[in-house]
Amino acid sequence: MGNAIRLLRKCLNSHGVSASSGGVSALSRDLLNFETTSQVPEKLGSYVVSSQKAQANWYRKILEAWKQAKPRPKTPEEASRLVIAALKNHQKADVEGLLSFYGLPSPHNLVEVPTEAPVSLPKGVRFELNTLPVDTKSVADGDTVTVYVSSKDPLVSSSLPKDVSLAAVKRAKAREKKNYTEADALHKTIIASGYRMISFQNEEVLAKKFRIRLSGIDSPESKMPYGKEAHDELLKMVEGKCLKVLVYTEDRYGRCVGDIYCNGKFVQEVMLKKGLAWHYVAYDKRAELAKWENEARQKRVGLWASSNPEKPWEWRKNKRGGN
């Protein structure tokens, strides 16, 4: 019976939402409707094996957990974890069916919450960057992001060119006088020197630009399968956030190669576990990176849904060769 339901589930339309956008809001709406009417979604029965009476019992449990959650789930992963915890003693087929109905990750596809940022610097780290909030346009692809660090940071202030500092002062005075033409010209000079004025907490902050290449992973290029998904996942994690970057070295393109932490999440871990990057073993042999890639391979998530996905370094080599 369980196999028949799972087969039927593949043939039917879902709740009409995507895991990346509408699943959480659809669940929220249905919980609100259940609280008012005690009715479960009509089409849910096509995805689960239990009766409507049992389904109503699930929604009572999920609704209670939803109300107690602080903050409320915002991502598909958070919503999935809440449902799984609320229905931990129920049939696996029912839980997976309910998650499938909303387009939420199933238990075997659920990415574990990454580890917190290390208290002490790992071996090989040369310095640490603490960035200003990341802009939407700063994410180039799934493994490269541009960040800015305030000139008040000791690491930046110790090497701040005098002409850049002076240009920032002159720009502020020009803006006070509403001479925006001069202010814009001065800002172009600042930008050409590798700095920028960033609006932060109701003030203009002089900040230095750093291009960051995530250490140990290689995501699909933008024109490759899953290139857009990798870009979008990285953007979703870092957009508007202040990051901690542990820098190991500089690559031949002048980028800082390092680990990125965002709200305690290790960004490379998320990208690997979601199947949106390869472990770049040629440049980083950390065992945990290989482990996270292998977990994604076994679950066949992301790019590992393909039996033999093209490696980005081979794709780049072929492009350079004119193939």
UniProtKB/Swiss-Prot annotation:
Superkingdom as given in the UniProt entry: Eukaryota
Lipidation positions, renumbered (S-palmitoyl cysteine): 11
Residues that coordinate or bind Ca(2+): 143, 218
Notes on activation and inhibition: Inhibited by Zn(2+).
Localization in the cell: Cell membrane
Lipid tethering residues (N-myristoyl glycine): 2
Keyword check for Chloroplast: no
Entry's transmembrane regions: none
Named cofactor requirement(s): Ca(2+)
Domain TNase-like residue range list: 130-306
The enzyme's E.C. designation: 3.1.31.-
Summary of the function given for this chain in its UniProt record: Enzyme that catalyzes the hydrolysis of both DNA and RNA at the 5' position of the phosphodiester bond. Possesses activity toward the single-stranded DNA, double-stranded DNA and RNA. May be involved in genomic DNA degradation during programmed cell death.
UniProt similarity note: Belongs to the thermonuclease family.
Protein name: Staphylococcal-like nuclease CAN1
Organism: Arabidopsis thaliana
